[in-house]
């Protein structure tokens, strides 16, 4: 945990909640008006707005790939409640690497813009 940086600490808790498939914890860590832009379909992904929409997309992903897991390769705070998280997402027969650019507001995730390699 990054107890000296509340933004990185939040991202650690968010990743742990996803990996444990705890959708209640995921929902508690995001703002009511969160904006999440996924990586698919290419080239621009899909934009989801609001806690309920984001919860639904994560529930769908975790249901279709229950063995999947995120690993944080590197993350750093960019100041003003922003951070960059470089990650690897593994599932049964493959993986993808990517980056999320995030914004935190009042201790909750308010925006997550995801990008992948390839």
Which residues are covered by each model-predicted region?
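C-terminal and inter-domain tail/linker signature
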Residues: 1-118
């Amino acid at each position: 945990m990054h107890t000296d940086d509340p933004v990185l600490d939040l991202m650690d808790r968010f990743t742990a909640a996803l990996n444990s498939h705890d959708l209640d914890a995921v929902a508690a860590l995001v703002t009511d008006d969160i904006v999440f832009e996924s990586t698919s379909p290419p080239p621009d992904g899909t934009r989801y707005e609001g806690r309920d929409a984001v919860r639904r997309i994560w529930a769908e992903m975790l249901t279709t790939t229950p063995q999947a897991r995120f690993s944080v390769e590197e993350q750093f705070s960019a100041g003003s409640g922003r951070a960059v998280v470089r990650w690897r997402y593994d599932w049964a027969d493959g993986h993808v690497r990517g980056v999320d650019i995030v914004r935190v507001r009042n201790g909750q995730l308010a925006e997550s813009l995801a990008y992948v390699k390839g």
